[in-house]
Design a protein with these regions (language model features):
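Alpha-helix-loop-beta-strand connector modules within alpha/beta enzyme cores
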Residues: 95-118, 184-205, 254-266, 316-325, ...
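Conserved small/polar residues in nucleotide/adenosyl-binding loops
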Residues: 578-585
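N-terminal small/glycine-rich loop or linker at the start of catalytic domains
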Residues: 17-58, 83-90, 121-152, 201, ...
């Protein structure tokens, strides 16, 4: 799938390195801290004991020494000691008001270590601002863990990004992500900070999969890729959770399908319990061999997570690049600089470029092969008397059952409309239904509404990549200029009808001209990709008997042909209701 993300960076040195050669990250910060056997006094007192992030204030020497230990064995990128450095997790230690201070200090420590290593060897080093989970799970149903809004989460990550960038980070790393909806909020919050601050550095996102290949709420790697690739990020990957042996299948999928660079930072195997402590048993040699294999298959960035030590990374450098990094340290600076040209280049990839949407569990091709893509329309208050009555009764569970039955009958996506003339709480009903549907059906959802704020409310709750339906030019640009920013913000796709100020288009040329207007606004002004756009060319029922509409079906078919020929990449759809005299509920 081709993305239309044209970005100007204030610092893109890291991406330059990724394009040039396989980049090696560091290993485990937590494991390294444990080796120091620190006491409560090192953490600043008993109340802060165990808050690793606070060591950036109380023991910056320890954190800098850990960074240096990885830089000395060939790591080009070190992660800041800020994995739990957001206001929600720091608040557990009474440090929620010191987010900027802690993150800024952490980035400055890593920056100092990287600059010194670069001065010693002549090899560029990079600071990755580590951003871990918030501790909330917005996709879930737990009343405590899910009790946070999308915008509140975005604010949490905005603040942490600010501290890291101000401290000198070269890139930001959202890592160990278990809830894809939280990741979306983090990406939105970070990009809002970039816009407000007038800066842009690369954004790398890494999800965590269990041994079955899924995130905490069942999201597989295909869904994660479809959801995240539509957002303004620069690298996608995986880290933590399992050792490298369980990452093979997801990595193969990313290599075959991701247009973005790929990162893989596994644990040193699955943890085992030894005397009440988690121990990661994988030794440096087998770990480095398996991870180097990923690099040979097309992964761009490798490193380690829990349990990985400088020994693991030294071996990884040697197996990826074919020589030990220590040899560089004994060379002159000019010799070290020359090794830049012998580092292994990334294996060229030719990913499949197919537009996808996703539920919170899996991805769906927007253009099925063989076609057509079937959109179920029974979860629709405007098209189903039964659903209308269920909405009036607020019987959402029965509506979910209808949705499940439509998916079982072959629907690839579901159109969801809850608008009722009898009620004025469309937003609240959409939110209630989307929350239940997201957990019950694996078909992606289409949010069918004339109200942009209702569409945004749905997207803010939806863990996958959805579609917004109801876009048109009926009132000129009034609607489109409200809808497209929302589509862009959440990485959604958009379904637009060929309606303009003069009404519904009847001729092939008029249908195409309206589609062209919408296409040009969406692509050239809002930065959407053609693959994000679906056009419903509309037609009247073939059985109207009205003479002036006799040729409507032919004009619709030819309008589709014109759109396909002249707007490469866009998709089209048509409601089968209008080609059949059957009742709407059939």
């Amino acid at each position: 799938m081709r993305r239309n993300h044209t970005r100007t960076y204030t610092n893109r040195r890291y991406l330059d390195a990724v394009e040039d050669h396989i980049v090696i990250f560091d290993g485990a910060m937590g494991t390294s801290i444990q080796r120091y056997n620190l006491t409560a006094d090192d953490f600043g007192g008993e109340q802060y004991n165990g808050c690793n992030d606070y060591l950036c204030i109380t023991r910056p020497d320890v954190i800098e020494a850990i960074h240096t230990s990885f830089l000395d064995v060939g790591s080009e990128v070190v992660e800041t000691n800020t994995f739990r450095g957001n206001r929600l997790t720091l608040a557990e230690y009474g440090l929620g008001g010191r987010v900027l201070e802690i993150n800024r200090a952490a980035a400055q420590i890593a920056r100092r270590a990287c600059d010194q290593a670069e001065a010693r060897t002549g090899i560029p080093r990079f600071v990755a601002g580590s951003i871990g989970p918030s501790g909330k799970l917005p996709s879930g149903s737990d009343p405590d863990l899910s009790n946070i809004t999308f915008d509140e989460l975005a604010d949490v990550f905005y603040e942490q990004a600010q501290g890291l960038v101000e401290g000198g980070a070269d890139l930001l790393l959202i890592e160990t992500s278990q809830d894809i909806l939280e990741v979306k909020a983090a990406v939105v919050g970070i990009n809002r900070y970039f816009a407000d601050a007038g800066v842009r550095i690369p954004l790398q996102v890494q999800v965590t999969l269990d041994t079955t290949g899924r995130m905490l709420f069942g999201t597989d790697i295909a869904s994660a890729l479809a959801t995240l690739e539509a957002l303004p990020i620069d690298v996608i990957g995986m880290n933590c959770s399992t050792g490298p042996e369980y990452m093979r299948a997801p990595i193969e999928y990313l290599v075959e399908n991701s247009v973005l660079p790929i990162s893989v930072l596994p644990n040193a195997g699955l943890p085992i319990n030894v005397d009440g402590e988690a121990v990661y048993p994988m030794e440096p040699d087998p770990f480095s061999e398996m991870v180097a294999e990923f690099a040979r298959k097309g992964v761009n960035i490798v490193g380690g997570c829990c349990g990985t030590t400088p020994e693991h990374l030294a071996q990884l450098y040697r197996k990826v690049h074919g020589h030990p990094f220590n040899a560089l340290l004994s060379s002159s600076q000019s010799d070290a600089q020359s090794t830049h040209f012998v580092r292994r280049r990334p294996r060229p990839r030719q990913p499949q470029r197919e537009a996808r949407v996703s539920s919170g569990m899996t991805a769906t091709l927007m253009a099925q092969n063989p076609g057509p893509t079937m959109i179920g329309e029974r979860v629709n208050s405007q098209g189903s008397r039964k659903v209308k009555q269920l909405l009036l009764a607020e019987d959402y569970d029965s509506i979910v059952q209808i949705a499940v039955e439509q998916v079982q009958a072959g629907a690839h996506m579901l159109d969801v409309c809850v608008a009722l003339t009898e009620r004025d709480d469309e937003r609240q009903q959409m939110e209630a239904l989307v929350k239940k549907l997201a957990q019950a059906v694996d078909a992606p959802l289409i949010f069918d509404t004339t109200e942009p704020e209702v569409a945004e409310a749905a997207l803010a709750l939806y863990p996958g990549r959805g579609i917004v339906n109801g876009n048109n030019l009926e009132n000129g640009r009034e609607r489109i200029d409200r809808v497209l920013p929302i589509v862009k913000k959440y990485g959604a796709a958009v379904l637009s009808m060929t309606i303009d100020e003069e009404g519904m288009a009847h001729t092939r040329q008029k249908k195409y001209e309206i589609a062209r207007r919408i296409h040009d606004i969406a692509v050239n002004e809002y930065g959407l990709s053609p693959e994000d756009l679906i056009f419903d060319t509309l037609t009247f029922p073939l059985t109207t008997g009205q003479e002036e509409l006799r040729g409507d079906a032919v004009e619709t078919i030819e309008g589709i042909r014109l759109i396909k020929e002249n707007l490469p990449g866009v998709l089209t759809c048509l409601c089968l209701l209008y080609t059949s005299p059957s009742p709407r509920d059939s």
